[in-house]
């Protein structure tokens, strides 16, 4: 087991600097934050208006295909993980429509102790065709894979994403805990 290094601050870069020289940052193999990178997206404008406007905007692109969603009881506190016996999970995976998921999220928003509900990495081209075109990433990338996470409060266990990621938080809040690549052997039991 490799010991963890001391946490360090993430480079915060200006969105204009990223737009001017994207290769410098996307090929740096170092995490960074560009907070205002997608502020001009219509999706962000809808989210700034209200959660309901955000969901309505997404539904305007929805293909109608079933999506996978994950549902955990309120007592998991949003932490999707193994069950206490470690022989299964503390959540259910369900197939549903984005319309139904959106309605559930609207309802749960007023619940003081809601169950946790989220739709994991969902490919935009298949489930929300046209959304990427209407909200283009303002830097040139070769064939980016664009996907959406959507849900209420959730805590996802550390995991390894093979592709490099540019995560754009367009509604609500999102926090990432990043580990150095040499820690991948410590992520899984």
Region annotations inferred by a language model:
Residues 1-189:
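N-terminal accessory scaffold of Fe(II)-dependent oxygenases
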